C-alpha cells in the first residue's frame, strides 16, 4: 500500500513541473526555451548544454524547430558542427545549392562561411550545435529570402 501511495504522489508531482523543464526532444536532451531572438523566422527552441568558456571552449546547444522555421544568414568565426537529431531540414552556404539534411547527418560549417539552416516547410527539425567560441560570437546577417527558402529541388 505504501508503494502505491508513493507512486501516486510521484505521478501527481509531475503535473507541477514547469512545461519548459518537462519537455525533452526525441534525442533525450531538454527542448529548452522558445527563443524570442530577432534572428530567425518561426518557432525555435534553444537549450544551452554547455556555454563556452576558457576551460571548455565550444558552446553546445540543442535547437528544435517547428516546420518552416529558419535562422537568418549568419557566420561562425570559429566554424560549427551540426549533429542532426530529428526531422528534415535545409542547410545552405552562400552561393551554393541548398542541401536537404536528415536525422543522423553531420554538417561541418567552415569558419567564416555565410550560411543558414532551418526546417523544411512540412517537417520539424532538431540538431545539436557544437560552436567554437574562441574566435568570436555568431555574426548575424539578413533574413533568408522566400526565394532562397523555396529554391530547394
Predicted region positions:
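Short, conserved beta-strand element in jelly-roll/cupin
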Residues: 62-66, 75-91, 130-132
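Bacterial N-terminal signal peptides that target proteins for export
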Residues: 1-7
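A short hydrophobic beta-strand segment most commonly corresponding to one strand
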Residues: 122-142
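A short, N-terminal "cap"/entry segment at the start of jelly-roll beta-barrel domains
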Residues: 17-57, 138-153
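Short beta-strand His + acidic residue motifs that chelate non-heme Fe in jelly-roll/DSBH
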Residues: 73, 91-92, 114-120
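Bacterial N-terminal signal peptides
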Residues: 7-17
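Short acidic-glycine-tyrosine-enriched beta hairpin
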Residues: 95-112
Amino acid at each position: 500500500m505504501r508503494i502505491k501511495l508513493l507512486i501516486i504522489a510521484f505521478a501527481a508531482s509531475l503535473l507541477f513541473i514547469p512545461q519548459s523543464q518537462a519537455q525533452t526532444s526525441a534525442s533525450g536532451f531538454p527542448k529548452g526555451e522558445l527563443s524570442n531572438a530577432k534572428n530567425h523566422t518561426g518557432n525555435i527552441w534553444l537549450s544551452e548544454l554547455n556555454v563556452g568558456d576558457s576551460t571548455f571552449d565550444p558552446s553546445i546547444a540543442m535547437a528544435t524547430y517547428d516546420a518552416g522555421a529558419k535562422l537568418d544568414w549568419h557566420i561562425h568565426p570559429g566554424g560549427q558542427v551540426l549533429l542532426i537529431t530529428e526531422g528534415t531540414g535545409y542547410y545552405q552556404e552562400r552561393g551554393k545549392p541548398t542541401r536537404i539534411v536528415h536525422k543522423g547527418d553531420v554538417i561541418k560549417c567552415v569558419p567564416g562561411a555565410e550560411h543558414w539552416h532551418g526546417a523544411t516547410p512540412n517537417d520539424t527539425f532538431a540538431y545539436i550545435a557544437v560552436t567554437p567560441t574562441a574566435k568570436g560570437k555568431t555574426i548575424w546577417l539578413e533574413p533568408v529570402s522566400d526565394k532562397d527558402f523555396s529554391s530547394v529541388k
